[in-house]
Amino acid sequence: MDGALFLLRGRTEAILTMKIHITSLGCAKNRVDTEVMMGLLREAGYELTQREEDAHVLLVNTCGFILPAKEESIQTILELARYKETGRCRALLVAGCLPQGYAGELAAELPEVDAFFGPGDVPRVTSIVAEVLRGKRSLEVGKPDFLYDHTMPRVLSTPFHYAYVKIADGCDNRCGYCAIPNLRGRFRSRSEESIVEETRSLVDRGIQEALLIAQDTTCYGVDRYGEFRLAQLIGKLASIDGLRWIRLMYCYPSHFTPELIEAMAAEPKVCRYVDLPLQHADDELLRSMNRHAGVDEIRRLIRTLRERLPGLAIRTSFIVGLPGETEEKFQRLLDFLAEMRFDRVGIFTYSREENTPAGKLADQVPEEVKEERYHRAMVLQQEISLSIQQEWIGKTLEVLVEEEVAPGLYRGRSEREAPEVDGHIEFKGRHRMIGEWANVRITAASHYDLMGEAIDEPGE
């Protein structure tokens, strides 16, 4: 008899372990929420499974940031719902940002879903599952004010050698195009002690790289301590024995302090890499979108970062087709790309979102114009990226080994590549283990990846 450990009419009944499969969509911040839910469910006695067809409970943690993410979430829900007809599935639950913004509409349109809950309801996941298994449909979405800490169980879904550490949640920036403050709530920082304790625990479990994430990582501490405290946090994390790399993701340009730049320059464990979403290069558009850093300020910041951090790899992102973007303003973006020569760039077409200031503007750009500008920007950046990649030919990089793709052929990353969003380094070598380090001489380059050969073979 299939079953689980769950509450039934006020009693706790132990039945054969019930299996749960969780699908996580969207950003790394959402992924951490998924990992916390996995920890809570496993602690409550459920068995986690990677096979949807074996699961008695299916849960999808959705993204609701832009239209393509919403469409992917809906499609995933519909695909999982089929297992209620063909598999063991007894319950389908939908979590995350999509129900936070659209729970009522979703409940009406998706009767096959047994529960909807938001990011603020993560701590209640076990009770929500129990309610559903008792036959009660759960449609209550709470305030998005949850903030996990080091005391909560967490099951890592990343490879054993790296993990995301969410140092804050929510956002107070209120960019004109973005619905995140409505979906994730106000900005709120974890305590330094909690972050350090969690990171130390992760290192004890084998991770060598901690990726610091938040909606606005550089704003860390301002709500809790009354000042920006990312520089101090870096110093404390760097003191953890066994931690090799600290990587900064989702850095807001106007919140970079001189102290942070100096901390990055002084601490060898901080990767010479920064993720710095800039969104556009026209001052009028930046102001209309409530971005607080102008183009000249951004230029100064990038020059300072490159001066203080030689070899720095900069990842950024831009939005084409923002309301009011004329051909002249778009050309400023192209000129800026050519001038600044960023290592890695994500180009996105503007997605008109409900309940955002930009979504209410009249001067929307036609979809075909957005697509045409997207392709022009991508072609330019690909040329820039290839040129930068080719500059590494003949040089040696320290590489974290992540995969053996064939006998004698390995794949990994240097400090210049973040997992999942950037390329990789493929190299020839012998007897390498996942999670080990290799010095690799670069012999070839493509737009996104590097190729090479190990020069420090074991036993030589």
Swiss-Prot record:
Residues 157-387 form the Radical SAM core domain. It comes from the Bacteria. The keyword rRNA-binding does not apply. GO terms for molecular function: 4 iron, 4 sulfur cluster binding; aspartic acid methylthiotransferase activity; metal ion binding; protein methylthiotransferase activity. It is an enzyme of class 2 (transferase). It catalyses: L-aspartate(89)-[ribosomal protein uS12]-hydrogen + (sulfur carrier)-SH + AH2 + 2 S-adenosyl-L-methionine = 3-methylsulfanyl-L-aspartate(89)-[ribosomal protein uS12]-hydrogen + (sulfur carrier)-H + 5'-deoxyadenosine + L-methionine + A + S-adenosyl-L-homocysteine + 2 H(+). Pfam families: Radical_SAM, TRAM_2, UPF0004. The keyword Cell cycle does not apply. Its EC number is 2.8.4.4. GO terms for cellular component: cytosol. Residues 390-456 form the TRAM domain. Residues 18-134 form the MTTase N-terminal domain. [4Fe-4S] cluster 1 binds at residues 27, 63, 97. Belongs to the methylthiotransferase family. RimO subfamily. This is Ribosomal protein uS12 methylthiotransferase RimO. It comes from Heliobacterium modesticaldum (strain ATCC 51547 / Ice1). The gene is rimO.
